[in-house]
Regions:
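Hydrophobic transmembrane alpha-helices
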Residues: 2-3, 11-77
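Alpha-helical membrane segments and adjacent membrane-interface helices in multi-pass membrane proteins
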Residues: 45-122
Length: 206
């Protein structure tokens, strides 16, 4: 998975002129980290509890927020996009070892398609003097990303379900998923911040 992810990032960067959104080139170190965390998402995605509704309870949003908090917004976004791309081409990286475009077009596909935005928001790091304030803002941004995922997922679910309205699905999500996802998101930002520090000191991240 890491090798496939690395190739995908290189192809994506070359197609965009060899640069990231911030204008800096991706080096081997960055590509390796992106591939590694795409692999981390693959592992986390297999942890799920099936539900009668067809939408499993997972800790995937923990993984998305973690990737953003550790890698930062650019690399976190790319790692999530790479994960989705390698799943879309058929590798079994989605939950329950599924793969293929059909997963993205299915009932839960809207949630997956919202993940890059959540990773991006989770990776924005304020640079104010107060570390507590910085962490609080990171958590709020990650929670905003989580709500974006819940909304995009509910939109696609409602369109495919036909007999369920968007408001009904969101109401159900507020009861069944959002409280759990919010706790996991907050935890992921805190844990991710701690993981990032030694990586920065070692020179793997800036």
């Amino acid at each position: 998975v890491e090798k496939a992810a690395g190739r995908t990032v290189e192809e994506t960067v070359e197609g965009a002129g060899g640069k990231t959104a911030g204008g800096s080139r991706l080096g081997t170190r960055e590509i390796v980290l992106i591939g590694m965390f795409a692999a981390v998402l693959t592992v986390i995605s297999q942890i799920s509890l099936p539900m009668p509704t067809g939408v499993p309870i997972t800790i995937q949003l923990f993984g998305i927020a973690l990737v953003g908090a550790v890698l930062g917004w650019k690399m976190g976004f790319l790692a999530t996009v790479v994960y989705i791309l390698i799943g879309a081409v058929g590798l079994p990286v989605f939950s329950n070892f599924q793969g293929g475009f059909a997963v993205l077009a299915g009932m839960t596909g809207g949630y997956i398609l919202g993940w890059p935005v959540m990773a991006l928001l989770s990776g924005i790091r304020p640079t104010w003097k107060s570390k507590t304030l910085n962490l609080a803002v990171m958590i709020l941004l990650a929670l905003a990303g989580m709500m974006f995922v819940e909304f995009t997922g509910a939109v696609q679910w409602s369109r495919l379900a036909g007999d369920q309205s968007l408001s009904a699905i969101m109401a159900y999500s507020f009861v069944a998923f959002i409280p759990k996802d919010a706790v996991l998101t907050v935890l992921a930002v805190i844990v991710g911040t701690q993981i990032r520090r030694p990586l920065v000191r070692a020179g793997y991240l800036e």
